[in-house]
């Protein structure tokens, strides 16, 4: 643990000079400017940030993530050279240029020499790389992450198979190539053109294809192509295979095509780079099987929308009569996720008007994973009997059947309850093998279900499009017990606790920045009322801008089915168009000054009113019709959806760009409040990120929009409303 804290401290030490010196440079630039130029320069800063983001995204296609620093150093060198022409000291151009060139070369050389990237020992790829015959077949640098295709004798298809190899006359998992993303294994690929698929007979996933032969199936995730081969082996009549990750698709259709083509060239198979939401919005034929691959959820962040309540509603509506949805859930560390998936399905079916939703669900499992089957029609005795026989032959366990249909009491895979003790004593182990998931499922889907959900240690609320966090079951009210059982928390839940820690840390630094003027002459030179308004105004801007950005990125991840594209598009659109708004805030007053001369005075608040009104209208539309419009537009092409998202972000960004420069123009130039305001804005922007994440997990992203309403309303009320003479805003000679 101490080693991890030391690593975090080293990251801070490495990043501190970059951001400290950048902030110092920008603050000094503001102090050197006249009021009318603040908007233009701040706009240039924002547009430059947007352009820089595009440069970094392009560099990610060619460089290892740790070496991206090499692309930044030339930009700093160029900024230093350009600063010479505004410097208040005299230096020969060749002296200054030589100094910059020397620092540039030393910095590039030091970065290339001292950066030694390696994977953490806890990453899945670390032991795989240490195998004697390990061979890296392919490396891919991408904004999506750092991909490696690994070949060694330990790599096998990661699939849940029965242990009854002899009885079923099958072999174990076939040899495969492992695909790792940032050190985590996310998929497998066949090693050759010929693959023995007999193992599929013992697979946990294959039951729907035995139940519905000659099915039209939708595969959400292909498991590197293996799922396609397995479905064809079990006589699927038509397959639509979806992959949301473009790099997986490129590997299948590129260097590994010789191993994959016998499956994907089959006329029954259609392979698309698409997420399930947009595809189902345009498909009208319906499916007999909708099958979610077990690794799909962990392959990309945007894939989390595949297990929301609304997604399950879409799957059910896309089923033909007698059709079935097959959903995976990992129970290796927690049985709780299986309960959450059942609760999500129950609420989805209730929302669709299905009476007795438990009659449409069956749950079966191995020792490590479970499958929830959701049927279009209530399960029949024949279908339930088929599942029981399937599980008995393979030593799998049935954890839930509707209508309390009797099943074998024998448990093949012991599954103890997930129990966290508030003290040091742990509950005694049961003397016989048990199925805690069966016991909990019966309570969850019974008449006592509401009491069971309310009293459960974990939060079983379904994930939704507004709260798309399937791996989020911790209750803040149980924080003390959570810390006592920290070693038992799955990796997927750690992000919630990290956000809590980062929020506390960022609040400390933000409050430190806030009190700085009160410790020096600036606090005594400026009226307390002015200081208070400055604190409120720029803190609100820092929080509000980031809340809008984070909300739009998440909306875009669902709408585009790709978080990387959504992040890039929203970030660039907001920076560029808020930069345009900032520039307009400086241009419009000077044109008004001409109209107002010689007698007039100009009030910046007169520009803030229309900007605030436009923002309020945008927020109202985002809280109201935006979600239905996004859902309606899912069937559009990806470029059309990108255009819509970019335009929607731009409509908010232009009025947002007015607030900061207009606020700076109201601060006394003889004080140090201008750099302090810049620091406040930056510090509370940092606070906004963990705070937004925690709010989204707890109450949903809509809460951020309501907070933005409040924050920008408060900022408007705290904006100084005293007139500024046009002479004060005159240009310096």
Question: Model regions: which residues?
Answer:
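Alpha-helical transmembrane segments of multi-pass membrane proteins
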Residues: 1-163, 167-183, 188-205, 209-733
């Amino acid at each position: 643990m101490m080693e991890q804290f030391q690593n975090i401290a080293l990251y801070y030490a490495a990043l501190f000079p970059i951001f400290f010196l950048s902030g110092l440079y920008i603050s000094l630039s503001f102090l050197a400017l006249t009021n009318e130029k603040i908007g233009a320069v701040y706009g240039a800063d924002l547009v430059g940030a947007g352009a820089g983001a595009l440069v970094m995204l392009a560099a990610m296609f060619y460089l290892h993530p740790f070496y991206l620093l090499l692309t930044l150093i030339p930009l700093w060198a160029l900024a230093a050279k350009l600063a010479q022409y505004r410097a208040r000291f005299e230096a020969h151009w060749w002296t200054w240029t030589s100094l910059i060139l020397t620092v540039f070369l030393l910095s590039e050389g030091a970065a290339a020499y001292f950066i030694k990237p390696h994977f953490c020992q806890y990453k899945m790829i670390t032991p795989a790389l240490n195998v004697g015959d390990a061979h890296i077949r392919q490396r891919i640098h991408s904004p999506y992450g750092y991909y490696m295709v690994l070949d060694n004798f330990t790599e096998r298809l990661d699939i849940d198979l029965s242990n009854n190899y002899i009885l079923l006359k099958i072999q174990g998992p076939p040899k495969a190539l492992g695909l790792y993303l940032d050190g985590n294994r996310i998929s497998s690929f066949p090693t050759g053109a010929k693959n023995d698929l007999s193992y599929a007979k013992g697979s946990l996933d294959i039951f729907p294809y035995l139940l519905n032969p000659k099915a039209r199936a939708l595969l959400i995730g292909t498991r590197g192509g293996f799922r396609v081969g397995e479905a064809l082996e079990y006589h699927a009549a038509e397959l639509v295979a979806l992959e949301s990750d473009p790099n997986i698709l490129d590997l299948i259709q590129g260097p590994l095509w010789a191993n994959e083509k016998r499956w994907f060239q089959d006329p029954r198979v259609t392979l698309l780079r698409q997420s399930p939401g947009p595809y189902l919005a345009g498909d009208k034929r319906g499916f007999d099987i909708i099958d979610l691959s077990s690794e799909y959820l962990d392959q990309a962040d945007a894939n989390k929308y595949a297990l929301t309540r609304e997604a399950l509603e879409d799957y059910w509506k896309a089923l033909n009569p007698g059709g079935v949805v097959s959903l995976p859930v990992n129970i290796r560390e927690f049985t709780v996720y299986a309960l959450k998936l059942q609760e999500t399905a129950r609420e989805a079916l209730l929302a669709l008007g299905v009476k007795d939703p438990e009659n449409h669900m069956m749950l079966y499992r191995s020792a490590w994973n479970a499958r929830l089957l959701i049927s279009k029609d209530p399960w029949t005795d024949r279908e339930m009997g088929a599942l029981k026989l399937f599980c008995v032959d393979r030593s799998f366990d049935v954890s839930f059947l509707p209508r309390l249909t009797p099943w074998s009491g024998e448990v093949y895979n012991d599954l103890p309850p997930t129990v966290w003790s508030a003290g040091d004593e742990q509950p005694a182990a049961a003397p016989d093998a048990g199925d805690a998931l069966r016991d909990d499922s019966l309570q969850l889907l019974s008449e006592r279900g509401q009491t069971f959900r309310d009293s459960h240690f974990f939060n079983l609320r379904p994930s939704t499009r507004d709260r798309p966090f399937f791996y989020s079951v911790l209750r803040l009210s149980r924080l003390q017990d959570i810390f006592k059982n920290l070693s038992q928390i799955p990796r997927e839940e750690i992000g919630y606790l990290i956000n809590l820690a980062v929020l506390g840390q960022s609040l400390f630094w933000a409050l430190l920045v806030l009190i700085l003027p009160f410790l020096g002459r600036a606090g005594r030179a400026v009226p307390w009322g002015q200081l208070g308004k400055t604190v409120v105004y720029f803190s609100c801007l820092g929080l509000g801008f980031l809340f809008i950005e984070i909300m739009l990125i998440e909306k875009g991840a669902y709408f585009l089915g790709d978080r990387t594209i959504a992040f890039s598009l929203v970030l660039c659109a907001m920076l560029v168009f808020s930069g345009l708004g900032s520039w307009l805030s400086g241009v419009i007053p000077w044109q008004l000054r001409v109209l107002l001369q010689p007698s007039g005075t100009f009030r910046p608040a007169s520009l803030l009113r229309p900007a605030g009104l436009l923002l309020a209208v945008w927020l109202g539309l985002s809280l109201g019709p935006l979600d239905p419009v996004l859902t309606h537009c899912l069937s559009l092409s990806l470029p059309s959806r990108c255009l819509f998202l970019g335009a929607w972000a731009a409509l908010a960004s232009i009025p947002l760009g007015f607030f900061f420069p207009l606020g700076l123009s109201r601060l006394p130039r003889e004080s140090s409040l201008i750099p302090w305001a810049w620091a406040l804005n930056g510090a509370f922007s940092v606070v906004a990120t963990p705070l937004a994440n925690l709010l989204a997990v707890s109450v949903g992203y809509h809460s951020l929009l309501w907070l933005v309403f409040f924050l920008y309303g408060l900022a408007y009320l705290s904006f100084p409303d005293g007139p500024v003479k046009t002479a004060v805003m005159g240009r310096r000679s």
